[in-house]
A protein has these predicted regions:
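Conserved alpha-helix/loop element of class I SAM-dependent methyltransferases that forms part
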Residues: 64-81
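A short glycine-rich, Lys/Arg-flanked "PGG" loop and its adjoining helix->strand segment in the class I
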Residues: 164-176
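Conserved beta-strand signature within the Rossmann-like core of class I S-adenosyl-L-methionine
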Residues: 178-184
């Protein structure tokens, strides 16, 4: 399956651009996503996760099961109740909303660089008193030093112009004993470098896992519904590009997962000193 002309141009420019330009381009893309797709039933933007565990969900959350399961996989080994929690790259807010009502943190702030996505999330989830969304840059987090208990990041960091700066920012903002829950995809050389970035920032790695199979299983399960949703709600000239970014079957990211050229990872880390 072809990427679609907008996605091809976007990918080429990303490869040759410096970090600041890449940040601007991703911001532009996600602003466009938010404006083009304002349906209230489109609240998640991740690839999903499917394993042998059956997560108990409410009837209203069931249609988003696989997307919620990715969030749950990322944060399930830490205790969020009564804690101060941040999501970096909160998108349309579906994951943060579910975590805020399910795990009952004292306060959960979702930061995203798309002003339109932040606006939609604040509108949709205004009734959740422990949840808020703010516009923010992952490489310059508007957080005090040593102020947060848990920071999590889901399928977002591959967009950042300088992921090392992001990791250092998270370390700065966490309290001693605080956790970073991170999940995203990388090729092998880039993941090896990122592993060293985590260590060099001062994090102790509590656990790590390759979850590519579980993500692929989810992508296969929701492929037809994604294609149908894009077909019904996205302008004709953008359909293939949306399919590429959604990771539907036959697109470059999906095929890279299948071929073993891209892997999806999950890391749990602690700021030990």
């Amino acid at each position: 399956m072809a990427m679609g002309f907008p996605a091809r141009v976007f990918a080429i420019i990303l490869r040759i651009s410096p970090g600041r330009v890449r940040n601007w381009m991703w911001r532009w893309w996600y602003q466009r996503l938010a404006k083009a797709h304002q349906r209230a039933d489109f609240r998640f933007m991740n690839y999903g996760y499917k394993d042998d565990e059956t997560l108990k969900l409410s009837k209203e959350d069931e249609p988003n099961r696989l997307f919620i399961q990715l969030y749950n996989m990322n944060i399930r080994d830490v205790d969020l109740k009564g804690k101060e929690v941040v999501e970096v790259g909160s998108g349309r807010g579906g994951g943060a909303s579910w975590i805020a009502k399910t795990y009952e943190p004292k306060k959960l702030i979702g930061f995203d660089f798309s002003k339109d996505a932040v606006g939609l999330a604040n509108e949709w989830y205004a009734s959740q008193t422990n949840l808020s969304f703010k516009e923010g840059n992952a490489e310059s987090l508007p957080l005090e030093d040593n102020s947060q208990d848990i920071i999590y990041n889901v399928e977002s960091s591959h967009c950042y112009g300088n992921v090392e700066v992001f990791v250092k920012e998270v370390y700065r903002a966490l309290r001693t004993g605080g956790h970073l829950c991170w999940t995203d995809f990388r090729d092998k050389p880039t993941m090896e470098k990122l592993h060293e970035i985590f260590l060099n920032a001062g994090f102790e790695i509590v656990s790590k896992k390759d979850v590519t199979k579980e993500v692929l299983d989810a992508l296969d399960d929701i492929n037809d519904s994604k294609v149908k949703g894009i077909s019904e709600s996205v302008p004709m000239g953008m359909k293939k590009s949306f399919e590429t970014f959604a990771g539907v079957q036959g697109t470059p990211v999906y095929e890279a997962f299948k071929a073993g050229n891209l892997h999806y990872h999950r890391y749990l880390m602690v700021k030990s000193e």
